[in-house]
UniProtKB/Swiss-Prot annotation:
Expressed at low levels in the veins. The keyword DNA damage applies. Keywords: DNA damage, DNA recombination, DNA repair, DNA-binding, Hypersensitive response, Nucleus, Plant defense, Repressor, Transcription, Transcription regulation. It comes from Arabidopsis thaliana (Mouse-ear cress). Disruption phenotype: Accumulation of DNA damage leading to constitutively activated DNA damage responses (DDR). Increased basal expression of pathogenesis-related (PR) genes (e.g. PR1) and hypersensitive response (HR). Chromatin modifications at the PR-1 promoter that mimic induction (e.g. AcH3 and MeH3K4). Dwarf plants with distorted leaves, reduced root length, early flowering and reduced fertility. Decreased susceptibility to the beet cyst nematode H.schachtii. Mutant plants display enhanced resistance to the bacterial pathogen P.syringae pv. tomato DC3000. One of its GO terms (biological process) is chromatin remodeling. Component of the SMC5-SMC6 complex, a complex involved in repair of DNA double-strand breaks by homologous recombination. Transcription repressor that prevents expression of pathogenesis-related genes (PR) via histone modifications and binding negative cis-acting elements at their promoters. Negative regulator of hypersensitive response (HR) and systemic acquired resistance (SAR) required to dampen the basal expression of pathogenesis related (PR) genes. This is Negative regulator of systemic acquired resistance SNI1. The keyword Oxidoreductase does not apply. It comes from the Eukaryota. GO terms for cellular component: nucleus; Smc5-Smc6 complex. GO terms for molecular function: transcription cis-regulatory region binding. Interacts with SSN2. Binds to NTL9/CBNAC to promote its binding to promoters of target genes. Component of the SMC5-SMC6 complex which consists at least of SMC5 and SMC6B. Interacts with RAD17.
Length: 432
């Protein structure tokens, strides 16, 4: 966002006479919809959305909507009776937030600018008027929304609309959480000011005592990994499902980044007892994947953030890798740090009885899935913590698969494993 745009945001947020008249004129379009039939009421709502767009987004110096106007748009998104209304309100809200952010990094890069009393779809307190009470999103509602997105539905038009509405709503809420969390985390990394993240929408949602975080994460994984039959669903639903998956993956990364930042703050001693304690998302994910091989395979197919995918696999495998012997003057055992890198873990498959013991504990298919996905993820980015070259890692992955066959000739290399071996071989050939 440009400096000029930021400046315009600050000045335009001051309520002016024009802003007051804009609110009165636009809201008048939908205040009387209760007395009209549904078709006329829907037309009035569409006209209201267009009026807000014309006043706030079309002009170069458009004025931001008032909180009541935002509230009315959000109400249309949540309770809209047609796909056109839901789509139009979703697009308008996301564009308005891009144009008029409530939190952003200042020009100094270590300062966060926050707009006071900016509207939010979330509510974290009890001081809320009756109009917002049934509209604003609380922590428990988010958990229920995730559960509802994973429910089987009938093939009726009404059911499809309900599912579409839930997906649009989740996409929007994830978008708001990202716009709020990203600048806060960026400045936190520069300043180690924990209060910036403590007050983020994401932290406030997850810190609520009303939320069972473990159950939330289980529902989250189940929803994210659920399949949708393209032959039985409309094209619009299938496409929106893809968009929803993208939003879910981004939100999951944010949750793990929040946990990482919280851990740093804990180590620095800048948190307090009031910040609460909850199990990190990574631990819950690992527990769920450990006891469900199908979920593990599906999750690694769906979740495509290479950095976090690699981290999840490494932590999974570390539980089954023999602990390194403490180094002495006479030993040549690799240092413990080696077991924290992909190449270090792959090398353990070439040492003695390690392949047999690891395969016995988690199964040959799971081993192939884990090391294969970790390898493909590692190929896509540079890891400053791992000094080994890509060529070394390619050689190690080939050696690991060879060791699996050496353990038991009956072990079948999965088609996915063959793809991994082919990729490793091609990389080595290209670098030769």
């Amino acid at each position: 966002m440009s400096k000029e745009t930021k400046g315009n945001n600050n000045t335009s947020r001051v309520m002016s006479g024009y802003g007051g008249s804009l609110e009165a004129n636009t809201l008048a379009m939908i205040d009387s919809t209760g007395a009209k039939d549904s078709r006329d009421a829907n037309e009035d709502r569409l006209q209201y959305l267009e009026a807000v767009r014309a006043a706030s987004l079309v002009p170069e110096n458009g004025i931001p909507p008032t909180n009541k106007m935002y509230q009315a748009i959000f109400r249309i998104l949540r309770f809209g009776k047609t796909l056109e209304l839901i789509t139009a309100s979703f697009q308008l809200l996301t564009q308005l937030h891009q144009r008029f952010p409530w939190v952003y990094v200042s020009d100094s890069a270590d300062q966060l600018d926050i707009v006071d009393e900016a509207w939010s779809p979330f509510n974290f307190g009890s001081d809320v008027d009756s109009d917002e009470k049934d509209l604003s999103v609380r922590s428990l509602f988010l958990q229920q929304l995730i559960q509802n997105m994973n429910k089987r539905v009938n093939e009726s038009e009404e059911s499809d609309l309900k599912i579409l509405g839930n997906m649009f709503l989740f996409k929007y809420l994830a978008h708001v959480l990202k716009l709020d969390f990203t600048p806060r985390n960026q400045v936190y990394e520069e300043t180690m000011n924990w209060s910036l993240l403590k007050e983020s929408f994401l932290n406030l949602l997850l810190a609520s005592r009303k939320v069972n975080f473990k159950l939330l994460m289980k529902d989250y994984l189940s929803t994210m990994c659920a399949s949708i039959d393209a032959d039985e669903k409309s094209i619009s639903l299938v496409e929106l499902h893809k968009d929803m998956l993208t939003a879910m993956k981004e939100l999951l990364v944010m949750i793990m980044e929040l946990d990482t930042s919280k851990k740093k703050a804990d180590l620095e001693g800048i948190t307090s007892r009031g910040d609460g304690v909850r199990t990190p998302a990574m631990e819950i994910i690992l527990d769920e994947l450990t006891y469900d091989g199908y979920l593990l395979s599906k999750f690694l197919q769906v979740f495509d953030d290479p950095k976090w995918k690699l981290e999840i696999v490494l932590q999974y495998l570390t539980k089954y890798i023999p602990k390194p012997v403490v180094r002495t003057r006479r030993t040549t055992v690799p240092q413990a740090e080696d077991s924290k890198t992909l190449n270090g873990i792959l090398k353990t498959f070439s040492n003695g009885t390690n392949p047999k013991n690891i395969t016995k504990k988690i199964g040959p298919d799971i081993v192939q899935i884990l090391i294969g996905h970790a390898f493909l993820a590692r190929l896509t980015f540079s890891d400053p913590h791992e000094g080994d070259s890509i060529s070394e890692i390619c050689s190690s992955i080939i050696s690991a698969f060879t060791s699996l066959k050496r353990v038991d000739q009956k072990i079948e290399i999965l088609p996915f494993g063959k793809e991994v071996l082919f990729t490793a071989g091609m990389v080595l050939k290209a670098k030769a």
